[in-house]
């Protein structure tokens, strides 16, 4: 029995079906792909129907279909009064999902606030904000990227 989960078998079946991994029911985690392991991790968090969730890189290794499904489930949770604390390096996704955030580099909080409050203007995105806050210029980062691409050719 899973603490706090009534009707466990039905809930397990629901989340296995929701994540499309019913056929993996009896498979050991070590034998699952990274994406399947991520689905198991998320299902184990979602099964409790929590009002508060802490997630670390929740969309890592998920295909776009399940990224979208999970993103919508999480947004619905927030809309119904839930709270999510999430760590992510995918700033584009964080910008679409979060109403408040902290930008951290090397363990130090560089800035926190609303997504719009962190931007200098409407043209700036969170990737631009991060680059600015860590003391680089966008032009410098793009130049370094171009140099790395030239070396690979």
Language-model regions, residue ranges each:
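Conserved ABC ATPase "signature" region
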Residues: 1, 6-24
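Conserved ABC ATPase signature
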Residues: 28-32
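Catalytic Walker B motif of ABC-type/P-loop ATPase nucleotide-binding domains
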Residues: 53-56
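Conserved catalytic motifs of ABC-family nucleotide-binding domains
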Residues: 49
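ABC ATPase "signature
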Residues: 112-113
């Amino acid at each position: 029995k899973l603490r706090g989960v009534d009707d466990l078998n039905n809930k397990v079946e629901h989340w296995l079906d929701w994540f499309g991994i019913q056929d993996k029911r009896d498979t050991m985690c070590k034998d699952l792909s990274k994406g399947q392991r991520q689905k198991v991790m998320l299902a184990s968090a979602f099964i409790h129907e929590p009002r508060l969730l802490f997630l670390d890189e929740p969309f890592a290794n998920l295909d776009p279909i399940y990224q979208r499904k999970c993103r919508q489930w999480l947004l619905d949770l927030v809309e119904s009064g839930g709270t999510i604390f999430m760590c992510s390096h995918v700033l584009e996704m964080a910008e679409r999902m979060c109403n408040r955030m902290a930008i951290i580099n090397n363990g130090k909080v560089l800035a926190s606030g609303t997504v719009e409050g962190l931007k200098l203007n409407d043209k700036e995105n969170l990737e631009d904000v991060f680059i600015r806050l860590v003391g680089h210029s966008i032009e410098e980062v793009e130049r370094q990227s171009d140099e790395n691409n030239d070396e690979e050719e």
